Amino acid sequence: MAFKLWERFSQADNVFQALRPLTFISLLGLAPFRLNLNPRKEVQTSKFSFFAGIVHFLFFVLCFGISVKEGDSIIGYFFQTNITRFSDGTLRLTGILAMSTIFGFAMFKRQRLVSIIQNNIVVDEIFVRLGMKLDYRRILLSSFLISLGMLLFNVIYLCVSYSLLVSATISPSFVTFTTFALPHINISLMVFKFLCTTDLARSRFSMLNEILQDILDAHIEQLSALELSPMHSVVNHRRYSHRLRNLISTPMKRYSVTSVIRLNPEYAIKQVSNIHNLLCDICQTIEEYFTYPLLGIIAISFLFILFDDFYILEAILNPKRLDVFEADEFFAFFLMQLIWYIVIIVLIVEGSSRTILHSSYTAAIVHKILNITDDPELRDRLFRLSLQLSHRKVLFTAAGLFRLDRTLIFTITGAATCYLIILIQFRFTHHMDDTSSNSTNNLHSIHLGD
């Protein structure tokens, strides 16, 4: 019975079924669209999800307002200093701005998310004309594993965080802990949505590269170009040894799914140009839809990483601020929070970097084909595609301020280290001023006593 249920759930023959995990978050209002499995296969906005998003955001604002009015915060339960009060206020401000941006773009820019899915459907139809079909089941399982992993990650994180607070004899109110938990949940859902959409683009870039690689393999076989470097196989280098053995013995078998591509490469290159153009439009729409929410998420993640590091160093440098019984819980709580935000940034960076990496393979394969073929019509198509590749490059940014690639990790590390040193210097300067003030008051008291 369980096996049949799993087989039924894991079945995916189109992009709609592959996006089932993404539609689950529509109940929270962060994906206000619905998929119609009718013959027309339409993607429509959902009024229910739009209403759920408004209710969700108003509930967060209510909890946030009550916690601010009562002056409760998680860090305030441990210790209070001028810097912690400043950091707490900064995190509150960035938190409400980030949540407003996330819900605002999710609800009022939802048509862009719908256009992303619709353009993916058009791309899949072009692939079918070329005799290719995406592995929708793999996409479904990939998104399902990502959603399950993020769900378990957040459940464990929030449960352990609450347990650490309770074990430290801290009992946060429902409003305070809800204000703490909801941003984590919403950030995770937005990042999950970003990973799903970038994976849709990445998988299609990968399929596009396979088409070009098949054209390249066909030319290598026809010309018996054994002198070419094994690196000519861009999609999968291991295929070269198998291709070499076939060239020595018998030609490689041409499968029916690639017959259109090999028999009419000019038509295939023309369709590849159309697919690449649509994929660039998809990636541009992804950037426009996620640019400000991701900017808010990265900004608040950077601040949490910075201040969590400072809290831990503050407790190490001045252990008297913490009771002996709550010191272990303090370190564990803020270390877990630090790791959580680092994981979020890594997921964003990897989701965009993998898509950019697969899109960059296309230009390499195109120029490898140009170096081999002498067909004037095919070369003309390839030159046009090469020009398109040079002008339409995939790039993800956060409102154009910085790129969402692996260089962002190095940038955040350097900036956090710099500001952490400044905070430590400010802390020591403030501590020295307090010490000198106390010494002056003591000397003045002694002088008056005399």
UniProtKB/Swiss-Prot annotation:
InterPro entries: 7TM_chemorcpt. Residues 69-87, 160-171, 314-329, 425-450 are extracellular. Glycans are attached at residues 82, 438. Residues 1-47, 109-138, 193-292, 351-407 are cytoplasmic. The chain crosses the membrane at residues 48-68, 88-108, 139-159, 172-192, 293-313, 330-350, 408-424. In addition to expression in a large number of taste neurons, Gr28a is also expressed in a few nonchemosensory neurons, including the campaniform sensilla of the wing, leg stretch receptors, and multiple dendritic (MD) neurons in the abdomen. In larvea, is expressed in neurons of the terminal external chemosensory organ, the dorsal external chemosensory organ, as well as in the ventral and posterior pharyngeal sense organ. Probable gustatory receptor which mediates acceptance or avoidance behavior, depending on its substrates. Atypical expression also suggests nongustatory roles in the nervous system and tissues involved in proprioception, hygroreception, and other sensory modalities. It is also possible that it has chemosensory roles in the detection of internal ligands. GO terms for molecular function: ligand-gated monoatomic ion channel activity; taste receptor activity. GO terms for cellular component: axon; dendrite; membrane; neuronal cell body; plasma membrane. It holds the Pfam family 7tm_7. It is a multi-pass membrane protein. Keywords: Cell membrane, Glycoprotein, Membrane, Receptor, Transducer, Transmembrane, Transmembrane helix. It comes from the Eukaryota. GO terms for biological process: chemosensory behavior; male courtship behavior; monoatomic ion transmembrane transport; sensory perception of taste; signal transduction. This is Putative gustatory receptor 28a. The gene is Gr28a. Belongs to the insect chemoreceptor superfamily. Gustatory receptor (GR) family. Gr2a subfamily. It is found in: Cell membrane. Its main location: membrane.
